[in-house]
């Protein structure tokens, strides 16, 4: 989990931060003047802070959820892997000369059960983000991920994927190396794997970059994550030639977990701690682990042919339209 670092505040969090700072100041003053009892005042302010936190995080707009999904302190794939795994061995390379750092994966045990885990990996700071390409995988990253999936399928190990990317890397080099083909190959192969596949959006789920590791029997989303065909900024720039209309685009795109659950795109929403996953990473990881274990237990009751059939039907039912 992330170490304690300088707190980064989003605009809608500032009133809460001011109240928490006031509580801390009163506590410090009480230490210097032990004869004054401020316990009742602190109790009232803490109750007010709890209520304010609940009000803020229960009524977030889509664009505010987007800000949370992109929060620099939000737990990454490696944070969750290390928190939910009994054991973890990272694997490397696509066996074609590439080892894309934007994709991590390997073998793990979750509640004693051997699994393969794959995820997009963002950086923790600017230097790390540059090294990880901000979680935007290239063709080699998707070939690396399908290699790990095929390994899991060969040995009967369920596959867990963590999605957290603005999208696949759009660079010329990525296109030259077959970015589109690599993602398309993954989509086709994931439909045919025999083992259970559980995909979880832990932050940003952007376009084909998310889909490249996003075909599964269960699609989960953390409460304040987002899943979209295009970023709200890109959508606004395309439709209205004005990226400043991102808030309007975010509303129209239905990018939030509860919107997507309502229209049947995802299967379940994993609750986050009050204040978001970055406010209590360990609790967020525990919630995620509980949801994954439950999904694995449910999927184990199905045969491989049943899982493959339901997986295919699940994705075929998305985006159905009628011609008139």
Curated annotation (Swiss-Prot):
Residues 44-298 form the CoA carboxyltransferase C-terminal domain. The keyword Protein transport does not apply. It catalyses: N(6)-carboxybiotinyl-L-lysyl-[protein] + acetyl-CoA = N(6)-biotinyl-L-lysyl-[protein] + malonyl-CoA. SUPFAM superfamilies: ClpP/crotonase. It is an enzyme of class 2 (transferase). Pathway: Lipid metabolism; malonyl-CoA biosynthesis; malonyl-CoA from acetyl-CoA: step 1/1. It holds the Pfam family ACCA. One of its GO terms (molecular function) is acetyl-CoA carboxylase activity. Its EC number is 2.1.3.15. One of its GO terms (biological process) is malonyl-CoA biosynthetic process. PROSITE patterns: COA_CT_CTER. Keywords: ATP-binding, Cytoplasm, Fatty acid biosynthesis, Fatty acid metabolism, Lipid biosynthesis, Lipid metabolism, Nucleotide-binding, Transferase. GO terms for cellular component: acetyl-CoA carboxylase complex. Its main location: cytoplasm. Signal peptide: none annotated. It is found in: Cytoplasm. Component of the acetyl coenzyme A carboxylase (ACC) complex. First, biotin carboxylase catalyzes the carboxylation of biotin on its carrier protein (BCCP) and then the CO(2) group is transferred by the carboxyltransferase to acetyl-CoA to form malonyl-CoA. Acetyl-CoA carboxylase is a heterohexamer composed of biotin carboxyl carrier protein (AccB), biotin carboxylase (AccC) and two subunits each of ACCase subunit alpha (AccA) and ACCase subunit beta (AccD). Belongs to the AccA family. This is Acetyl-coenzyme A carboxylase carboxyl transferase subunit alpha. It comes from Trichodesmium erythraeum (strain IMS101).
